[in-house]
């Protein structure tokens, strides 16, 4: 068994330890200059056989130092931490990480670092560094002028300062001429074929507003019932409409028949009619902002119910229900961001050059997602880490009495750069599903179709991971990164198939390097989506018949342990099949001779699509300073690959559980991670990580809620 020692960025000399406190070994103080997590062998614990054959640290890609003889040790904070914490790390995380490109890049450095993302609410940075290519054309005259600086700034300002408002409305009436200006602005919107498909129904009647309020309330309740507990708690606090508090409500409709059957541009895309009306809404919203009027868009309606309640013609589509009124103030940030419900996605995530995936802001060279992500992975923040240890000492409990949970809460502080750290809630388990060509070798008793069938089960809510997620209040997010069969579109399924299953790695590489990188990107993008959607913890999950064979191969490559020692019985196989499975792994390793220094190459040769995606999730989570709770053997294999790509990604990892698969023990030892739960589980799907989630949340909550000796008036020892 091993224990994780959390070490910081730029640590300095350790403070003198107090009596009874765990003491950091001297080696750690010397060696922790770079690594985020330093695995430390725990000598008095049960010896684990694979430790004996572990590769010497010197040949590892990771800079982490293994301190073989140390006691169970917990590092002390550096005397004067070098890095400042970010006080509101939560709201800023997404935007902020983009501006820190100077971290470790293991392969080659990107040709050009991405430009920093403008702070939300700030003016955009000056224009592109290189001039856009000119289209050769006879120069006749100067192009039509844009606005002067002040006018342009006014236009940009109104866009920046437009807010969706639900709180702080005033009852002041809206003068007719003001409302008229706002409606005129809406009416100048662009529209498909100039069909101008909108109508505006201006509602002032208290009775109608009360009817609409009741309809919205019913939908709110119905929506709340669908939420995982972690989300439902947050949602309860949110205000989602101000129908009764605003003097004017405006219904914006779209007439899909307006302009007749030959409306230009609507021929193949009927949705252009409601899109046009949505543009009218944006115009209205901006004009209202310029008048000092707040607007709140309410979409908690059943459309047909609404059409009937308002007596609208049946052929109309309702595009928007808007609450309009004067307000006390316009918040700088979206109300959902302020409430911690969501985060702003940086512009650099969504601008592609020429083809999708070549991300680049104008004037930048396109950069690849993996390089950008790795560049943003930072060590734990020394100051927050130091504060966490200090706080643990002052909490009303004997020093060290929370054992491993103290280490977790310090890690969470260092990761988030704040102490106490945010409670990792809401959380989402990302279940990546993929099939494996090596299934053909008879390494499992289960038919391959079960992968797709289990995906349907996850989406239907009937699997063990659903039950555990329900219990702990987490969201289940299912990603098809490589299931062999075609899966029907289903709510909750992210269709991200890179290829329909890997090839049989006993006869050739499992996949190409490009496919491997694409699967890693799927994981990174999943991490980005889940974190931007407000999740504060990511859990790894996976489904893929035959994937323990793949995990064994990966673990063998990264740990150097013989396949015979780490290849387990997966879903339960007999001796004969087990012997074949070991032989299959052995043959694959002989065929490919994968080089652990080239982790992407290892994944391509003997990996799985879900393993590569989990690598991406770990790297993505680490780059967004969000904890990643690892599940079992496949997550362990992925974490080894992630560490080989970016050693500091381990700073975000928490081992949820120890699987019954022998390979998992080898992986955890190599990673230096101590599992929180040890129940002989061998299911996957994220089940072990889900069981561990409340422990991780408890570690953070204790930091928030446990009194200190001073505050509680308790005498110290
Ligand atoms: C199509 C659409 C529907 C929306 N529906 C709701 C809603 O029902 N309730 C709500 O509180 N906000 C709603 N909003 C507002 C968004 O939550 C808001 O635009 C987003 O959080 C960003 O904040 P900002 O508009 O202040 O920048 C809606 C916005 C749009 C564009």
Where are these regions (language model features)?
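Long, low-complexity intrinsically disordered regions
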Residues: 1-146
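N-terminal amphipathic, basic-rich helices that act as targeting or association modules
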Residues: 43, 93, 101-103, 118, ...
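N-terminal targeting/leader regions
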Residues: 131-172
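Small-aliphatic-rich amphipathic alpha-helix that forms the alpha element of a beta-alpha
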Residues: 182-187, 250, 258-309, 460-476, ...
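Glycine/small-residue-rich phosphate/adenosyl-binding loop
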Residues: 196-277
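A glycine-rich helix N-cap at a beta->alpha junction
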Residues: 220-228, 240, 311-338, 512, ...
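C-terminal helix-cap and adjacent tail motif
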Residues: 321-377
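N-terminal loops that bind phosphate or other acidic moieties
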Residues: 369-717
């Amino acid at each position: 068994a091993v224990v994780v020692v959390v070490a910081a960025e730029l640590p300095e000399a350790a403070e003198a330890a107090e009596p009874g406190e765990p003491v950091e070994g001297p080696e750690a103080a010397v060696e922790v200059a770079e690594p985020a997590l330093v695995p430390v062998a725990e000598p008095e614990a049960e010896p684990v056989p694979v430790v004996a054959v572990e590769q010497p640290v010197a040949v590892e890609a990771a800079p982490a130092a293994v301190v073989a003889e140390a006691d169970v040790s917990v590092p002390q904070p550096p005397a004067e931490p070098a890095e400042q914490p970010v006080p509101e790390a939560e709201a800023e995380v997404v935007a902020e990480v983009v501006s820190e490109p100077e971290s470790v890049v293991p392969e080659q450095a990107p040709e050009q670092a991405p430009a920093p993302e403008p702070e939300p609410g700030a003016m955009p940075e000056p224009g592109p560094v290189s001039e856009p290519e000119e289209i050769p054309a006879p120069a006749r005259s100067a192009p039509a002028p844009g606005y002067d600086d002040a006018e342009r700034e006014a236009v940009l300002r109104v866009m920046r300062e437009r807010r969706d408002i639900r709180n702080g409305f005033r009852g002041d009436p809206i003068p007719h001429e003001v409302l008229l200006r706002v409606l005129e602005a809406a009416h100048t919107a662009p529209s498909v074929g100039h069909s101008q498909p909108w109508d505006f129904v201006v509602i002032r009647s208290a009775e109608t507003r009360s009817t609409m309020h009741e309809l919205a309330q019913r939908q709110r309740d119905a929506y709340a019932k669908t939420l995982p507990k972690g989300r439902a708690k947050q949602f309860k606090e949110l205000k989602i409409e101000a129908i009764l508090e605003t003097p004017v409500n405006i219904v914006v409709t779209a007439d899909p028949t307006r302009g007749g059957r030959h409306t230009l541009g609507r021929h193949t895309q009927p949705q252009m009619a409601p899109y046009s009306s949505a543009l009218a809404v944006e115009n209205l919203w901006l004009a209202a902002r310029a008048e000092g009027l707040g607007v709140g868009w309410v979409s908690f309606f059943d459309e047909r119910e609404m059409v009937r309640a308002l007596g609208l013609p049946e052929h109309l589509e309702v595009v928007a229900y808007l609450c309009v009124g004067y307000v006390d103030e316009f918040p700088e940030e979206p109300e959902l961001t302020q409430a911690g419900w969501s985060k702003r996605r940086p512009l650099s995530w969504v601008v592609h050059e020429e083809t999708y995936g070549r991300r680049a802001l104008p004037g930048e060279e396109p950069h690849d997602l993996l390089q950008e992500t790795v560049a943003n992975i930072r060590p734990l923040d020394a100051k927050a880490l130091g504060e966490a240890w200090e706080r643990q000492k002052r909490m009303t409990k004997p020093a060290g009495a929370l054992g491993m949970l103290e280490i977790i809460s310090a890690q969470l502080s260092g990761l988030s750069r704040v102490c106490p750290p945010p409670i990792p809630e809401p959380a989402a388990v990302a279940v990546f599903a993929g099939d494996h060509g090596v299934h053909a070798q008879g390494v499992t008793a289960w038919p391959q179709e079960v992968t797709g069938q289990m995906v349907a089960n996850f989406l239907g809510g009937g699997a063990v991971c659903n039950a555990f997620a329900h219990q702990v209040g987490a969201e289940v997010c299912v990603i098809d990164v490589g299931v062999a069969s075609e899966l029907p579109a289903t709510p909750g399924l992210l269709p991200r198939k890179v290829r329909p299953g890997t090839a049989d790695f006993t006869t050739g590489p499992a996949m190409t390097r490009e496919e491997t990188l694409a699967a890693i990107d799927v994981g990174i993008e999943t991490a980005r989506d889940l974190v931007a959607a407000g999740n504060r913890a990511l859990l790894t999950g996976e489904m893929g018949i035959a994937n323990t064979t793949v995990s064994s191969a990966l673990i063998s490559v990264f740990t150097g342990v013989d396949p015979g020692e780490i290849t387990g019985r997966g879903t339960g196989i007999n001796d004969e099949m087990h012997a074949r499975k070991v032989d299959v792994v052995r043959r694959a390793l002989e065929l490919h001779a994968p080089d652990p220094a080239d982790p992407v190459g290892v994944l391509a040769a003997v990996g799985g699509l879900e393993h590569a995606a989990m690598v991406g999730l770990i790297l993505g989570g680490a780059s967004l300073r969000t904890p990643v709770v690892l599940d079992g053997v496949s997550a362990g294999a992925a974490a080894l690959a992630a560490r080989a790509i970016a050693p500091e990604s381990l700073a975000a990892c928490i081992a949820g559980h120890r699987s019954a698969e022998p390979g998992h023990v080898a992986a955890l030892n190599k990673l230096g991670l101590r599992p929180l739960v040890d129940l002989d589980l061998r299911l996957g799907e994220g089940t072990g990580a889900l069981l561990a989630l409340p422990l991780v949340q408890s570690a953070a909550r204790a930091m928030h809620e446990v009194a200190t000796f001073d505050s509680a008036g308790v005498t110290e020892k």
